[in-house]
Amino acid sequence: MNVIEGNLVGTGLKIGIVVSRFNEFITSKLLSGAIDGLTRHGVSDNDITVTWVPGAFEIPLVAKKMAESKQFDAIITLGAVIRGATSHFDYVCSEAAKGVSHAALTSGVPVIFGVLTTDTIEQAIERAGTKAGNKGWEAAVSAIEMANVLRGLA
């Protein structure tokens, strides 16, 4: 029996990060967590490319372009969508998630969904480096593992 598993060795991996400027007080913390997670696992600063976009809705297009460029072993998407009084939250969350998934499936490159979708600002803060850890860091570790899984399948 063959078992293919990813590992958490980031040495030599090239990682793209797409991060939303909207709710930057949260997304900047997610970005710091992601970069910390990548570098602690051996990814060189020179092998990390960060691209800022206006909001979560714009993330999928840039993630897809980066993935299709074949310059990256994985793409991490980071954003923070916080529920408001209208249904706008539902549309943005749904389309961001669908778009990120589509980018991965059409490009064959892992595109990791690190977009927070929370009901409150407090929940977002908790997931950006306090009580609930840093979801940017978790997305970075997932990106490394998935890049290595795909290398194992090649």
Swiss-Prot record:
- Please name every pair of cysteines joined by a disulfide bond in this record: none
* Pfam families the UniProt entry points to: DMRL_synthase
Q: Does the keyword Endoplasmic reticulum apply?
A: no
- The EC designation for this entry is 2.5.1.78
Binding residues for 5-amino-6-(D-ribitylamino)uracil, per the UniProt record?
F22, A56, F57, E58, A80, V81, I82, F113
Could you give the subunit structure recorded for this chain? Forms an icosahedral capsid composed of 60 subunits, arranged as a dodecamer of pentamers.
This protein is called 6,7-dimethyl-8-ribityllumazine synthase
Source organism (scientific name): Geobacillus thermodenitrificans (strain NG80-2)
Give the gene symbol.
Answer: ribH
